């Protein structure tokens, strides 16, 4: 009787753990959907530098490496750019929760803790980096219709905004990518609750496939939209696959 009670307790505890893990992974799914839509609205445009010679030629020396960005932002209306930010910033907390889910997928240890830390750090930085596209893009729009005397001040403001955007965006993406790399390594080493084949669903290889595929169609609006959301689309694929694996394997889950 005692053995039956102990087995029942272990079974209930395992079911609770699986339910909690599934909930965290679903938070990642919802966040990835929100951020994918936001990316498509914010940067999912085909580059048309020939339509904006002021930015792509005349002011290009002053804009430097940000000239292409300034041109890209002209394709979206202010309302579209705004809605390209809101779904992402208001769902960022779900990505933070999903980072705990990724941590619980890995076998406890130093690698799992480091992976969680860098993933959480990257997600925490991401709203500022993402919102920076809106503010910098709006300055780029003002540049297009400004009078000559306003150029120096507007160009200086644009460069300051772009620098802030670049620092936070690169730090966020780099940190998140490092977290996914650690998970990829652990998956291949069979030190996660996922099968080794799930390495193909990791955002790094999935994102590479999406980016390369979209680059083959530079004038396609669909490719531009998908390419602009590459990283979040890749994370959506992962969280869906991980949630499916957890649900399928259920209480019998073992690392690798």
Where are these regions (language model features)?
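Hydrophobic, aromatic-enriched alpha-helical segments typical of multi-pass transmembrane helices
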Residues: 2, 8-255
């Amino acid at each position: 009787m005692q053995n039956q009670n102990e087995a029942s307790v272990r079974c209930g505890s395992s079911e609770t753990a699986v339910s909690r893990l599934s909930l965290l992974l679903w938070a990642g799914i919802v966040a990835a959907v929100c951020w994918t839509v936001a990316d498509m609205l914010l940067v999912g445009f085909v580059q048309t530098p020939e339509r904006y010679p002021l930015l792509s030629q005349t002011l290009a020396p002053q804009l430097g490496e940000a000239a292409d960005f300034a041109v890209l932002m002209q394709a979206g209306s202010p309302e579209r750019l705004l809605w390209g930010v809101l779904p992402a910033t208001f769902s960022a907390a779900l990505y933070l929760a999903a980072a705990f889910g990724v941590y619980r997928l890995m076998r406890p240890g130093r690698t799992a803790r480091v992976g969680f830390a860098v993933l959480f750090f990257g997600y925490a930085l991401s709203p500022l980096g993402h919102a920076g596209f809106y503010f910098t893009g709006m300055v780029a729009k003002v540049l297009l219709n400004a009078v000559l005397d306003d150029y120096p001040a507007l160009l200086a403001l644009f460069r300051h905004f772009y620098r802030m955007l670049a620092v936070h965006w690169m730090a966020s993406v780099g940190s998140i990518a490092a977290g996914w790399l650690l998970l990829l390594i652990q998956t291949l080493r069979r030190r996660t609750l996922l099968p080794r084949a799930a390495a193909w669903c990791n955002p790094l290889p999935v994102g590479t496939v999406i980016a390369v595929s979209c680059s083959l169609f530079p004038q396609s609006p669909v490719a531009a939209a998908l390419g602009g959301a590459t990283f979040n689309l890749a994370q959506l694929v992962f969280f869906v696959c991980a949630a499916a694996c957890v649900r399928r394997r259920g209480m019998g889950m073992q690392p690798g």
